[in-house]
Amino acid sequence: MKNIIITGGAGFIGSHVVRLFVNKYPEYHIINLDKLTYAGNLANLKDIEDKPNYTFVKGDICDFDLMLKLMQDYQVDDIIHLAAESHVDRSIKDPFTFAQTNVMGTLSLLQAAKIYWESLPEGYEGKRFYHISTDEVYGALQMTHPEGIPAPFTTKASSDKNHEAYGEEFFLETTKYNPHSPYSASKASSDHFVRAFHDTYGMPTIVTNCSNNYGPYQFPEKLIPLFINNIRHRKPLPVYGKGENVRDWLYVVDHARAIDMIFHKGKIAETYNIGGFNEWKNIDIIKVVIKTVDRLLGRPEGADLDLITYVTDRKGHDMRYAIDSRKLQKELGWEPSLQFEEGIEETVKWYLENQEWMDNVTSGDYQKYYDNMYSNR
């Protein structure tokens, strides 16, 4: 049996990866390692918690002694590393925590893996350290066509109504790093440490950089679940600046599928970009969410558009992200399975049908954070 640690497995993307691996590979023992910070929630994995090939361990990746003990106790063959502080707004207020978790936590995990794997007779043979990162490490692309031009490429994730790009450049695996926020700087540093462990010690590593994800179980500090919840309760929808910033959106289950494929078929020391060729201005995706929520709640279409409230822009707010994922499609055959409008429909339905989950994660400390972030802007 292969023993795999998945860090951050109680979080948004991590829980989808854990669920996929536990259900798809009964011959794998999946060890879900999560600190259970505000964004980690074991309720995300209730449906698999009793599976015989699943184990949960509460722990902090910054705890090197614990990481080494877990490697030894579970005889870990592979690591899929998703644990991270990931919200840009929080990184602006508390960059130290982001550096501690994302940089030092990754280094702790790398060093523990190095010590354990090098102690084995076979060394690194058959081992893999797969590090999941973000497109934000590349910086920002110019929005040379604010009115939109026909997208040069599409995937099934692309909108059937919005085949537009807002510039001619896209992030490639060879794009130079140029992080602009404390969050992206911390992720860029962790990416470099992972590659350095391959170049220096021969550790078998892979890095992937993904575009914005959406879907079930996302903590509602992020745009789509935040707005679904606010629309439901007819609360203001805080939009940074003019809402013109552009992001490439991918359904989280398709990201998990890509991680599965890259883990099994990806080449060691390679980087793969994961995206959907699905660019949207923030204001446009907000309007889609409003119309979808209103329709599913039986309200007149667009009845809640007046909830849009423009607030002071985020410091250092990157204008446009857009991923070119053709390398992954060409070399490994991955493509998204869900078209954008289908994904939004499924996402809105899930949050509306799981209000208890939303109520549980938006109580207490989250409410204090929300009030602090948006009440005075």
Q: Whereabouts are the PLM-identified features?
A:
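N-terminal Rossmann-like NAD(P)+-binding domain of SDR-like oxidoreductases, especially those catalyzing
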Residues: M1-N213, F263, N282, E346, ...
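C-terminal substrate-binding subdomain of Rossmann-fold SDR/epimerase-dehydratase oxidoreductases
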Residues: I4, V17, I30, G59-C62, ...
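Short histidine/acidic/glycine/proline-rich micro-motifs that form metal-
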Residues: L36, T97, N212-G215, N245-V246, ...
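Short, well-ordered secondary-structure micro-motifs
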Residues: A43, Q142, Q218, L250, ...
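Intrinsically disordered, low-complexity segments enriched in polar/charged residues with Gly/Pro
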Residues: Y74, A84-E85, F170, G215-P216, ...
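The catalytic Tyr-centered alpha-helix of NAD(P)H-dependent dehydrogenases
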Residues: P179-S186, P216, P220, I224, ...
